[in-house]
C-alpha cells in the first residue's frame, strides 16, 4: 500500500503513531475500546497509516491491534510494531495484520549498553528479521532506532541491508530529538540516495522543540512519509504534531496530504479527552488561542479581513476565532462583540464601556462578554435589542 508515493511526488503519507508511540507517554493508558475509538477518528481524518500498537508487548496490545485492524483495516493501512526477532514478528502476524514496523537500534550507545551486540550482529539481525517478515508476505517498514546518533556510514549500511532484505520503506527516527533542520535535511538526503526509490519516512521527537521543523526538513530532503501523533503526545517532550506537520506541508510547502483538515480540531479534542492530556492553550492549529485576538489593532484588522492577522482560517482546521476583551482591546472589537449580543451603542458609550473594561483588566480581573454586556447596559442611553 502507498507505493504510488515516489520520491519526486508532491504527495506525503501521514503515518499516525498516536496509539503506539503516543500511548507510551507516562500516564497514558488507553483501553481497547478507547484505542478503537481513536482509530476510527484517525481513519475518518484521512491518515494513510495507523500504527495500532506493539502486539508482542502485552495481551492487551495484541487484542487492541487485532480489533483496530478489524474496525478500520478496510479504510487505512494498519501496522504493528515489532522488534527484530522472529517471536515478535510471529506475534504480529497472528493479529492478521499485513504491515509490520520492524526496528533495531544502530547507535553505538544502544549497541553497547542495551543490545550488547556488535555492528555485524545488528546487520545480521536486520537482514534476518526483514527477510523473515517479507517471506511471510508482509509489507515491511524498517527503523534503525537512534538513527541520528548512529555513525553515518554504518547507518547507511544498515539501511542498505534492510533494502537488500526486501524492506518496502525505511524510517529514520530522531529517537531523542537531537537533530536540527539543517543537519536532518542533509542526513535524509544521504539516506534517500541509497534507498533505491523506496519510500523514506521520518520520525522526530520534540526534546528541543524541533520535531515539526525537522519533519518538514526531512520531507524537503526527499522523505515522503512522516510519523506524527495527535497533539504531539509521546514520550518525554512528545513527537511531531500531526496537525502542525499537515498544515505546514500543505500551506507552506504545497505538498498534498490526504487529511481532511477541517476535522483536525475535533480529532485533537477526542484524543485529549480520552488520554486525559490537555491541549496547550497556545498550541498551534488546535489550541484555544490559536485564533484568539485581543489587541485593538489586531481585532480591527481581523474584522476587516481575517488574513491581516491569521495565516489560515480557523474553519479550515475546525477551530474557532475568539475575540477577547482586556486592557489591549479596542473599540472595533468591543463593538462587534456587543452587537453580536444585540447591544448597539454610539461611539461615546462604547468608549465609556471600553474604559471600564480596561480598568478591570488592569486590576487583574477577567473580562468576558457577560461582564462587558453588564457594563454596556449600565451606560447605554439607547434601547438595547436582546
From Swiss-Prot:
EC number annotated for this UniProt entry: 2.3.3.13
GO-annotated molecular function: 2-isopropylmalate synthase activity; metal ion binding
Cross-referenced SUPFAM superfamilies: Aldolase
Catalytic activity reported: 3-methyl-2-oxobutanoate + acetyl-CoA + H2O = (2S)-2-isopropylmalate + CoA + H(+)
Coiled-coil annotated spans: none
Any Pfam family: HMGL-like
UniProt binding sites for a divalent metal cation: 21, 203, 205, 239
Family: Belongs to the alpha-IPM synthase/homocitrate synthase family.
Subunit structure comment from the entry: Homodimer.
Biological role: Catalyzes the condensation of the acetyl group of acetyl-CoA with 3-methyl-2-oxobutanoate (2-oxoisovalerate) to form 3-carboxy-3-hydroxy-4-methylpentanoate (2-isopropylmalate). Carries out the first step of the leucine biosynthesis pathway.
Protein name: 2-isopropylmalate synthase
Gene: leuA
Amino acid at each position: 500500500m502507498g507505493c504510488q508515493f515516489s520520491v519526486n511526488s508532491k504527495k506525503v503519507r501521514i503515518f499516525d503513531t498516536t496509539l503506539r508511540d503516543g500511548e507510551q507517554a507516562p500516564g497514558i493508558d488507553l483501553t481497547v475500546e478507547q484505542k478503537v475509538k481513536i482509530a476510527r477518528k484517525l481513519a475518518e481524518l484521512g491518515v494513510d497509516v495507523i500504527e495500532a500498537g506493539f502486539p508482542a508487548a502485552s495481551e492487551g496490545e495484541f487484542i487492541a491491534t487485532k480489533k483496530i485492524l478489524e474496525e478500520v483495516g478496510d479504510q487505512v493501512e494498519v501496522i504493528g510494531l515489532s522488534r527484530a526477532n522472529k517471536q515478535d514478528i510471529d506475534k504480529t502476524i497472528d493479529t492478521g495484520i499485513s504491515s509490520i514496523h520492524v526496528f533495531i537500534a544502530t547507535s553505538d550507545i544502544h549497541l553497547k549498553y542495551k543490545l550488547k551486540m556488535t555492528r555485524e550482529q545488528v546487520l545480521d539481525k536486520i537482514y534476518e528479521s526483514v527477510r523473515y517478515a517479507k517471506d511471510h508476505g508482509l509489507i515491511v517498514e524498517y527503523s534503525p532506532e537512534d538513527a541520528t546518533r548512529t555513525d553515518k556510514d554504518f547507518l547507511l549500511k544498515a539501511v542498505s541491508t534492510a533494502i537488500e532484505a526486501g524492506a518496502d520503506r525505511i524510517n529514520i527516527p530522531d529517537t531523542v530529538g537531537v537533530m536540527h533542520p539543517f543537519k536532518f535535511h542533509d542526513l535524509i538526503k544521504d539516506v534517500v540516495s541509497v534507498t533505491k526509490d523506496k519510500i523514506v519516512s521520518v520520525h522526530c521527537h520534540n526534546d528541543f522543540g524541533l520535531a515539526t521543523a525537522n519533519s518538514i526538513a526531512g520531507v524537503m530532503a526527499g522523505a515522503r512519509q512522516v510519523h506524527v501523533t495527535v497533539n504531539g503526545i509521546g514520550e518525554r517532550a512528545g513527537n511531531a504534531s500531526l496537525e502542525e506537520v499537515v498544515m505546514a506541508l500543505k500551506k507552506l510547502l504545497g505538498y498534498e496530504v490526504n487529511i481532511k483538515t477541517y476535522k483536525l480540531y475535533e480529532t485533537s479534542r477526542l484524543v485529549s479527552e480520552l488520554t486525559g492530556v490537555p491541549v496547550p492553550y497556545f498550541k498551534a492549529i488546535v489550541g484555544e488561542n490559536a485564533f484568539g485576538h485581543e489587541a485593538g489593532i489586531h481585532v480591527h484588522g481581523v474584522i476587516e479581513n481575517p488574513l491581516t492577522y491569521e495565516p489560515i482560517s480557523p474553519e479550515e482546521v475546525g477551530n474557532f476565532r475568539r475575540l477577547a476583551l482586556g486592557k489591549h482591546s479596542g473599540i472595533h472589537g468591543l463593538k462587534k462583540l456587543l452587537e453580536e449580543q444585540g447591544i448597539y451603542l454610539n461611539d461615546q458609550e462604547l468608549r465609556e464601556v471600553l474604559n471600564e473594561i480596561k480598568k478591570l483588566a488592569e486590576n487583574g480581573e477577567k473580562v468576558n462578554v457577560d461582564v462587558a454586556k453588564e457594563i454596556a447596559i449600565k451606560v447605554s442611553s439607547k434601547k438595547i435589542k436582546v
